[in-house]
């Protein structure tokens, strides 16, 4: 049972030593805004030198994989391959490719509530997008899925169009994630994809299929490409309701870092309430603290 224990000393060396790999969330864990968390790039280098696999799981649907890789490089995280990066946009593209692609005469289009990064990921998967300028308006395919991602230009008109498509019972409703809000550098919050997905669900009377954390579908996407033993893998994140719950659902050892969204007090409140799937096994002040576990 997870008890939210401080990870240090002999326990730290044991937990990190036994781990074959580590899954990291990104924002609030590796960086905040445009600044890397102190010691984070060095930790990833040390993990690689120790032969520990590192993979990265983000609910951010704003960036396609190549753009996300550039962000890693810009913030000082070198030596990573784009194949190590898994976003909710990438996972949504995988799911829709599985569900929609078939013979040319049966392929449908995706109506997207989201930005260009999400659209780029879908195009890279060979999917057709409703309203895409490259499509012939006279030969536009039927919309067979509505995808809700992070959309800075969400509007009543877009909501209405999404609901019109969803009146077709065979039209899928997919959301990249349910994060309700995201923190800004000034301490304020901006609505997240979860807020937009809730609006579409309420207006359409439909329930979205969610691909990002805490859905195990994201772990399924990872295991398609990497051999991961969840019993010997750490899930390190900053949000209890997504990262830590995801880790528990997938059978990993969970570590909360206190450089992001969730606080130690929130974790302890979940522990007191018996909501153990939202309680990390361990916590650290920063992921830089994990380097002690790699020392000889």
Swiss-Prot record:
Mg(2+) binds at residues 25, 27, 238. Disulfide bonds: none annotated. Detected in brain (at protein level). This is Chronophin. Keywords: Cell membrane, Cell projection, Cytoplasm, Cytoskeleton, Hydrolase, Magnesium, Membrane, Metal-binding, Pyridoxal phosphate. Its cofactor is Mg(2+). Pfam families: Hydrolase_6, Hydrolase_like. Gene3D superfamilies: HAD superfamily/HAD-like (3.40.50.1000). The lineage of its organism: Eukaryota, Metazoa, Chordata, Craniata, Vertebrata. Its EC number is 3.1.3.16, 3.1.3.74. The keyword Zinc does not apply. The active site is at residues 25, 27. One of its GO terms (cellular component) is ruffle membrane. Divalent metal ions. Mg(2+) is the most effective. GO terms for biological process: positive regulation of actin filament depolymerization; protein dephosphorylation; pyridoxal phosphate catabolic process; regulation of cytokinesis; regulation of mitotic nuclear division. GO terms for molecular function: magnesium ion binding; phosphoprotein phosphatase activity; protein serine/threonine phosphatase activity; pyridoxal phosphatase activity. It comes from Bos taurus (Bovine). Functions as a pyridoxal phosphate (PLP) phosphatase, which also catalyzes the dephosphorylation of pyridoxine 5'-phosphate (PNP) and pyridoxamine 5'-phosphate (PMP), with order of substrate preference PLP > PNP > PMP and therefore plays a role in vitamin B6 metabolism. Also functions as a protein serine phosphatase that specifically dephosphorylates 'Ser-3' in proteins of the actin-depolymerizing factor (ADF)/cofilin family like CFL1 and DSTN. Thereby, regulates cofilin-dependent actin cytoskeleton reorganization, being required for normal progress through mitosis and normal cytokinesis. It catalyses: pyridoxal 5'-phosphate + H2O = pyridoxal + phosphate; pyridoxine 5'-phosphate + H2O = pyridoxine + phosphate; pyridoxamine + phosphate = pyridoxamine 5'-phosphate + H2O; O-phospho-L-seryl-[protein] + H2O = L-seryl-[protein] + phosphate. Substrate binds at residues 58-60, 182, 213. Belongs to the HAD-like hydrolase superfamily. CDD domains: HAD_Pase_UmpH-like. Homodimer. It is a peripheral membrane protein. It is an enzyme of class 3 (hydrolase). It is found in: Cytoplasm, Cytosol; Cytoplasm, Cytoskeleton; Cell projection, Ruffle membrane; Cell projection, Lamellipodium membrane. Signal peptide: none annotated.
